[in-house]
Every structure is written in C-alpha cells, then in structure tokens.
Amino acid sequence: MFALFYPLLNEQIAIANILSDLDRYLYNLDALILKKEGVKKALSFELLSQRKRLKGFNQAWQRVRLGDICEFGNGEAYETLIVENGDFKLISLNSIDIDGNLKNTMKRVNFYDNSLKQDDIVMVLSDVAHGDFLGLCAVIPSNDYVLNQRMGRLRIRNDCINILFLRLYINANQKYFKMQGQGSSQLNLSKKAIEDFEIPLPPLNEQIAIANILSALDHEIASLKNKKRQFDNIKKALNHDLMSAKIRVLKK
C-alpha cells in the first residue's frame, strides 16, 4: 500500500494545462522537423539528380568515380590508447549520427598521426546487419582528429571538388553502400566498392550553390532537433517538480 497525495482540483487543472501545453509544443516541433526533413529529402533528390537546376546554371555534369577524385585511407586500431582527457578526438564507428553529423562527444587520445586533416571526409566502413550507418559520411572540421579502425577517410585530390557537396551526395545515396556491404551479422565495405561509386559532378560553382542550400536546411533541422531535446528535458524536470509539489502552481 502507498499513500497518494494530490492537490486541490484547481491546482490539478493548472498543472495539467501547463504540461499539456508543453506536449502540444513538442508535438508541433516534431511535425515541423518531419516537414523540414521531407523538404530536404525531396530537394536533395531533385538537385543532386539534375531534375531541378538552379537558376543561372546550365553546364553539363561530368560522371566520375569516387576513387578518381578522392584518395582513400583506413584508420588504425587505437582502442588501447584511449585516455579520458586526451588532446585529440578519435573518430570511431559511433562518432557519426544517423544524419551524417559528427557527435559532440567522442573518445580521445594523446597523439596525432596525420591520419586526418581539416576538410577530410570520414566514412563508416562497418555496421551491424541492418547497415543503416554503412557509408555515412561527415566532414572533419579541424586538425585535432585521429582515425580509428573500421572508419575510412576520403581526401579530395584537387580543388575542383566541394567537400560539402560530396558529403551530401554520398549520404543521399547511402542505399548503394548498404547494398555493397559484405557479411552476415556484420556488414563491411571494401575499398573497391567505395572507389567505384560514381558521382555526377557539376562545375564547382554549382556544387557550392547546391551545398549551401542543402546545408542551410541541415542546420535548420539540427537546430530544431536541439530545441526538441531541450524542451524534452524541460518537460521531464517540470513534470517531476510539479507532481512532487517541489514547485507549486499559485493562483494569481
């Protein structure tokens, strides 16, 4: 048996209204995120497949192999060298989220091996059977990262490639990499499968224009998701405080 404590009816109603308002706000945020993600997916398909051309661009696109425009490299096994407060961030399998962005928290090491430089692209080379992360890419923002095993590195060979465009195109075509995964309980990507991936490549100025549009949508979606996480935490804390009478709803 346990005792149930509850406020007077008017305070019950006030608490319910506050939490219901938060629920409605979170629901609307979810709907907005889904809408923005749908817009981004549709626009990515149209822009990256040439179904829609941006105004002022009409030059032909060139079909290229990923291996011809990028140098591919593998990471090393550094799990035994991980330290709590290392100076360098270790790029591992769990360093990239499902949206193809680097996570804020990752393991660290105390050495730099020149495996990664600013503007390199890192790719997930191994995943469990569903393969949802296989081939996902993110861009390295600075020179304080080290590449771990089962992660790949793409480094552009010339200045005619925009790294943001390349990352967007690879992530929009992740189905190719999932199909190329080899194995049963764990899928792995081969160097050949990665280098043979073909990309329709527009002139550099069009790459930049496309990347700017889609990256702006990515930033907007990421901002909305961050706001959603913040309000989820607010609701959780407020729910606890109101239901435990730590915070009382006072009548004005």
What is each PLM-predicted segment?
Residues 14, 21-64, 223-252:
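Short amphipathic coiled-coil heptad-repeat segments
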Residues 67-79, 92-121:
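Sequence-specific dsDNA recognition surfaces
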Residues 1-10, 145-152, 182-205:
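A short glycine-rich beta-alpha junction/loop motif
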Residues 19, 121-123, 214:
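Generic structural signal for buried aliphatic residues
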Residues 92-94, 110-171:
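A short beta-sheet element
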Residues 9, 54-76, 98, 196, ...:
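Non-catalytic DNA-recognition/assembly elements of restriction-modification systems
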